[in-house]
């Protein structure tokens, strides 16, 4: 039996269930053998590089509410993915109300878990294997979650922890 959804997830008039507690996309992660060219493409599409990862060769591009991550970290999952698949989306991140619960439910339903390595001071984000060797991250920390306002205690997102502004 599924628990009732938090108010922020249950939309008026919605008749379907949301057992994973999803609440949108947090980011799409890209990898390419030539990350510079991919970044230039993002800029031509109107995205701006706004932050860099604190410890890795990873940039955050944003346009409105859309977040692209460009991962150029040598010997990372993303770069191994790019060597195998070429320029591509290597991962997506869903916003979920409770990442641990969503991960456990996905595994119970037959998904394959992915054990990544979080570095010092980084969030450990649960992930499952997606289509074509890609990853699906389950993120439960984002700004504005459950209606949080600027300055509210706990209104700290994934990007606030792992990235610093350019």
Where do the protein language model's features map onto the residues?
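An N-terminus-focused feature that recognizes amino-terminal "leader" regions
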Residues: 1-142, 148-164
């Amino acid at each position: 039996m599924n628990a009732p959804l938090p108010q922020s997830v249950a939309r008026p008039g919605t008749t379907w269930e949301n057992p994973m507690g999803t609440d949108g996309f947090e980011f799409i992660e890209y990898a390419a053998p030539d990350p510079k060219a991919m970044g230039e493409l993002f800029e031509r599409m109107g995205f701006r590089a706004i932050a860099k990862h604190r410890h890795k060769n990873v940039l955050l591009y944003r346009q409105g509410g859309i977040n692209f991550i460009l991962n150029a970290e040598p010997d990372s999952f993303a770069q191994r993915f790019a060597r195998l698949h070429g320029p591509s989306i290597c991962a997506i991140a869903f916003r979920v109300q409770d990442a641990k619960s969503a991960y456990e439910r996905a595994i119970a339903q037959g998904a394959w878990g992915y054990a990544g390595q979080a570095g010092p001071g980084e969030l450990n984000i649960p992930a499952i294997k997606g289509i074509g060797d890609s990853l699906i991250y389950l993120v439960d920390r984002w700004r504005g979650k459950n209606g949080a306002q600027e300055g509210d205690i706990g209104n700290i997102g994934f990007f606030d922890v792992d990235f610093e502004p350019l």
